[in-house]
């Protein structure tokens, strides 16, 4: 007897549920990759993630910002920062005029650890490489849309994506291969060059971000 997939009530099959199942499997593999890379550096994944977060932030970040970006509690972030400081991979200083606030910055030794960890790519990088070019591009844009939603509902801090950058001009050009413009470098670029974490990013004001997003997603 033929039983269709839709007749298996014990197995929820909404597309939303199945996508989350898929993301969960990918998250499992990413955690495994992170453990391998961190272990090779003599760190744990949270410590390595803190170094990666601070790598391109010359002015450092406060403990609260670090915790929010990593999705961990402030006490947990504080413990990891203390461990990294003992290893000489981070340094702490006062943040601006508020002498009680602590600013955390990566040291040259910390940068060296990041560079060594980067040399070993894991299975997730291989699985992305296995996608066709157009599939990579579609996935990148889908991720940007999901991340943007998570930002909007305050689930994560604003990321340094083109979609929130004051230099971003989506679909400013008629060239289908390079429709966007970055006013920071004054150059056209394509969908697959859209940034998730750009060092030159400067957050646009909310009205600019909303207008930019409208153009981007309708493009
Ligand atoms: S500065 Fe970076 S984030 Fe901003 S538009 Fe250019 S590439 Fe995108």
Regions flagged by a language model, labelled:
Residues 18, 22, 29, 33, ...:
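Pre-recognition alpha-helix immediately N-terminal to the DNA-recognition helix
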Residues 144, 148-219:
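Mid-protein regulatory/catalytic core that forms ligand/cofactor-binding pockets
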Residues 15-22, 46, 62, 106-109, ...:
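N-terminal positioning helix adjacent to the helix-turn-helix/winged-helix DNA-binding module
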Residues 83-136:
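Charged, amphipathic alpha-helical coiled-coil/dimerization segments
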Residues 35-73:
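N-terminal helix-turn-helix DNA-binding core of bacterial DNA-binding proteins
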Residues 1-41:
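N-terminal leader segment of winged-helix/HTH proteins
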Residues 58-102:
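Canonical helix-turn-helix DNA-binding module
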Residues 115, 119-166:
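Terminal interaction helix/tail motif
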């Amino acid at each position: 007897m033929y039983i269709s997939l839709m007749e298996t009530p014990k197995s929820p099959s909404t597309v939303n549920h199945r996508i989350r199942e898929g993301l969960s499997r990918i998250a499992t593999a990413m955690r495994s990759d992170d453990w391998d890379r961190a272990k090779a550096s003599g760190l744990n994944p949270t410590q390595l993630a803190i170094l990666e977060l601070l790598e391109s932030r010359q002015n450092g970040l406060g403990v609260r910002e670090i915790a929010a970006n990593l999705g961990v509690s402030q006490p947990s972030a504080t413990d990891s920062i203390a461990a990294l400081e003992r290893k000489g991979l981070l340094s702490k200083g006062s943040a601006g005029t508020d002498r009680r606030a602590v600013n955390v910055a990566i040291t040259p030794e910390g940068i060296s650890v990041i560079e060594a960890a980067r040399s070993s790519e894991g299975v997730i990088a291989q699985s992305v490489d296995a996608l066709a070019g157009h599939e990579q591009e579609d996935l990148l844009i889908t991720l940007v849309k999901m991340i943007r939603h998570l930002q909007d509902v305050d689930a994560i801090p604003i990321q340094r994506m083109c979609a929130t950058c004051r230099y971003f001009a989506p679909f400013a050009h008629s060239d289908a291969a390079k429709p966007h413009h970055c006013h920071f470098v004054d150059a056209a670029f394509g969908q697959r060059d859209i940034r998730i974490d750009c060092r030159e990013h400067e957050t646009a004001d909310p009205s600019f971000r909303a207008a930019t997003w409208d153009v981007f997603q309708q493009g």
